Amino acid sequence: MIKRIAAVALAGALALSVAGAMPAAANDDDVIERGSCSGSADWKLKLSPEDGRIEVEYEVDSNVNGQTWKVKLFKDGDRIFRGTRTTKAPSGSFEVRVVTSDTAGTNAIRGKAVNAATGEACRGNASF
């Protein structure tokens, strides 16, 4: 009987530890687009509502640490971010986060990243 209780308690503890390690699920209002770059890297563009504005998260994952990328984000054709990012451990990726206005109608968001050394290009689009 004591062994059975201990086994059930251990199974419950393992289930809780696994559930705690899982990433948070995307909100139902989020818009997430993914795609491949011109080389082996992948991109993800996530748009989320944030206090009447739009949170823009643009991620590039090349699986190689230390790469420098030139990054630009646009909203309805207007640049909202320009800068460089370097891929970092553990996954060889970077992320840019910008919060921008949520204007009337559809907001077209475009992300572009170019690897400074190889010229590999990532281009992603999403609408909110």
Which residues are covered by each model-predicted region?
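Bacterial N-terminal signal peptides that target proteins for export
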Residues: M1-A9
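C-terminal segment of classical bacterial N-terminal signal peptides
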Residues: A15-A24
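Transition segment at domain starts
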Residues: P23-D51, S127
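Solvent-exposed serine/threonine-rich low-complexity stretches and specific carbohydrate-binding patches
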Residues: I32-E33, D78-S91, A126-S127
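Short edge beta-strand/loop segments characteristic of extracellular beta-sandwich folds
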Residues: E55-D61, V99
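Short, surface-exposed beta-strand/strand-loop-strand elements in extracellular ectodomains
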Residues: T68-D78
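Exposed aromatic-hydrophobic patches
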Residues: S91-D102, G124-N125
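Edge beta-strands of extracellular beta-sandwich domains
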Residues: G111, A117-F128
